[in-house]
Amino acid sequence: MTITAPAATTAHAAGATTDPMRNHARAAGIFYLLTFVSSIPALILIGPVLHNPDYVTSGGQDTRVLWGCLLDAVNALTAVGSAVALYPVVKRQNRSMALGFVTSRLLEAAVVMIGVVSLLAVVTLRQDFAGSTGGDAASLTVTANALVDLRNWTFLLGPGLMPAFNAILLGTLLYRSRLVPRIIPTVGLIGAPLLLTAMLATFFGAIDQVSSVAGILTLPVAAWEFSVGLWMTFKGFTPSPVLPTIDPADTKAVAHPAV
């Protein structure tokens, strides 16, 4: 003799097992969107320390810069979060490439955090040695500008370089698995070499890092990351052989032995 579970419980169980990867898709998509929400305001907020060579000896806007550094740290964490959320899914397509994607995101986050720490050091110098004059002021300015230069290099080698490798690895995984419409990873795969071109041109001084040419070359990768974030957040994954198969029995009424 069996007792059939209530309909509400059955419906809940069916809904919970219908799409076991939905939470991974939503989490990854939200992390990708948070990258834009955090990185763009961060770049604006840290503007004073980046563009004022005398920031360390002047009345710096420390609170504003600190908020920008905090958002940059959030940006680094979202990179790690997206990789952690996607790995259990994309490893079903190719484990080595999935590990490569996680590694590239971790490296990107680490480089970003180095830049954050360098700007925090500038703020600390300004607060500890405010009002210094003469040789002390000159030394502070040289030190602070060196730290800002360090941050600029991390920006080039982190957000300026690693997204190209991310696009190649994740774009290939998503294209082959068809977890999202193929047009989305195609944009990333096209944009990756363009971003690498922009990075190398900037590295060797052919173009400025903040220029119209650099902006055009980086746009496809930005479009890829934004579109894949939107799709995974609101649509989830497209049915694919790499997704786990749901046993139809899991969606039926739950039977319990009679007492």
Locate the predicted segments by residue.
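Hydrophobic, aromatic-enriched alpha-helical segments typical of multi-pass transmembrane helices
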Residues: 2-259
